[in-house]
Amino acid sequence: YPKKNVLILEEHFVFGKREGYLSYDDIFLKNLNDIETLSAAFANGIIIIHDSISTGAELAAFASNEMLKDKMCVLEPDSTGIEERKISAFLELAFFSTDSKIRRIVYYPEVYSFEISEKHVEKRTNFVNNTITPILGDKICSFIDYCKLELDIRFEKMKFGKINNSVGVISYSKNGNELQVYVSGQVILYQVMGLLSINDIRKQLRKKKRLYEHIDFVCGQYKNILHHTIQEKLKSETNTILVSVKEINVELRDVIAYSLYMLQALELISILKEKELYKIGLKNNLGIFLSELDDIVSEEDNEILEFLNE
C-alpha cells in the first residue's frame, strides 16, 4: 500500500489552549466520545485493537452505533497465549451474534506479566518485535480493501418517516415549512471539500476573521446549497432547513468545524492564526485530491449552486 497521510489526533488537537495546536474548545467539542464518534463517522473503516478494559468500552460504544458497526474490525489477541478471552461473554452476546457484520481478526502477540501490586499480576501484550507479521498484515489489508468505497451520493425522500442508513444516501422529508435532512459524516466531509472548490467561498475564507465566523460561514453555505438542491427535487418551497448527522447527535456546525480541523491536520488546507483572527487557505494537495473526484457541486457559472448526485 502506498504511504498515506497518517493523522494522530493528539499531535494536532488539544482541549484547552496550547501553542501550535488547534483547540477542541474553539469548535465547541467538549468530550472525547463526540470526538471519537465524529472521527469514526468520517472514516471508511474502523480497526480496534482490543486488549484492555478501555478498548472494550470503545468497542461497545462503536458497535452499538448502527452507522458505525458495519465498518468495524476488531483485532483480538489469541486467548490461549494470554490465558483469557478479551472479548467477554457480554460483548460476545451483544455484538457478535451469527449475523453480526463486525469483522474479527485473531493475532498472536508477545505476552508479558505486568505487576500491579504484590498480589496482582496482569497479562499484557505487544506486537512481536513491534511489527505486524505478513499474515496479520494481509488480513488487515484485506479489511482495508473491503472498506474502500466509492461514495454513491444520492438524495432520497423518506418513506413513512424512515431514514435510509446507507452512507451515501441523503434522506429528507418536508414537515410543514421545514425541510428535515439526514446526512452521514462521510458525505458532509466530502461535500465540505467540494465547497472549498468554489472561488467565492475561498475568497471569504482567506479573510482574517474569528474562527467561529469562518465556521458559521461554511455552515451557512452548506445549508443554503443543500436546501436549494432538495427544494428543486421536491418542486416545493420550504422556509427553513434542519440538518442532522446520522451517526451522532451533535450540531451541524460542530461537524463542519471538525471537518475543517481534519482537513488541516491532513495538510489539505491551512488554518493560520494571527493574534485572535484566523484565515483559511487551500493547499496544493487539496487541489490534486479534488481533481481526482467527480464533480461535487454544480459549476460556478450557475446562478444558484447545487450538490450533485454521483
Regions inferred by a protein language model and the residue ranges of each:
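Conserved catalytic or regulatory cores that recognize and/or transform ribose-phosphate-containing ligands
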Residues: Y1-L59, S64-E310
